[in-house]
């Protein structure tokens, strides 16, 4: 005899999960916008050098992590909305939630860590080479890197909470 199907989660839990998915997507979209528009022109000895986010490998990794995280968040948002509307959850979604939330949360966390690390290291290097103050465009470039990394960190926190809920859901199911 098959075990009875698990009872559906309360509506407040479903709304919380939906809100966390939306917040994850919003944080990732804002991080993508800030990071992808991040550039600076450095004028040195009469020549101008345009410096983009894509010139820093860690920022590229951040961008990749944010894009992959956003794709996952959008897919999960559709599944969450469909579950919310129908009241039924496909058994495959338990596995997708469980493994996907963990994998993507770690990807986003490492993207955030890479952004914080490279922003600090490169900013310290620029301070050592030239007198850098808070009005310098180079400082603003790294501040935008910090902002993007912070937003990735916030999205990681949302994904980590979702990961806990998906772990509990799969434990209840089994």
Swiss-Prot record:
Keywords: Cell membrane, Membrane, Transmembrane, Transmembrane helix. Its main location: membrane. It is a multi-pass membrane protein. It is found in: Cell membrane. The chain crosses the membrane at residues 15-35, 61-81, 151-171. Residues 1-14, 82-150 are cytoplasmic. GO terms for cellular component: plasma membrane. Residues 36-60, 172-174 are extracellular. PANTHER family: CASP-LIKE PROTEIN 4A4, CASP-LIKE PROTEIN 4D2. Belongs to the Casparian strip membrane proteins (CASP) family. Homodimer and heterodimers. This is CASP-like protein 4D2. It comes from Arabidopsis lyrata subsp. lyrata (Lyre-leaved rock-cress). The lineage of its organism: Eukaryota, Viridiplantae, Streptophyta, Embryophyta, Tracheophyta.
């Amino acid at each position: 005899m098959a075990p009875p199907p698990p009872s559906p989660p309360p509506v407040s839990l479903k709304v919380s999960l939906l809100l966390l998915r939306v917040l994850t997507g919003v944080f990732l979209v804002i991080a993508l916008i800030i990071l992808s528009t991040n550039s600076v022109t450095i004028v040195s000895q009469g020549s101008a050098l345009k410096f983009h986010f894509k010139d820093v490998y860690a920022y590229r990794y951040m961008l990749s992590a944010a894009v992959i995280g956003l794709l996952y968040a959008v897919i999960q948002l559709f599944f969450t909305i469909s579950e919310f509307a129908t009241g039924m959850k496909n058994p495959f979604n338990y596995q997708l939630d469980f493994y996907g939330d963990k994998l993507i949360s770690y990807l986003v966390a490492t993207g955030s860590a890479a952004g914080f690390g490279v922003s600090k290291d490169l900013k310290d290097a620029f301070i050592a080479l030239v007198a850098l103050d808070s009005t310098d465009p180079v400082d603003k470039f790294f501040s935008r890197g910090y902002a993007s990394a912070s937003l990735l960190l916030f999205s990681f926190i949302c994904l980590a909470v979702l990961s806990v809920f998906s772990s509990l859901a799969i434990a209840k199911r089994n």
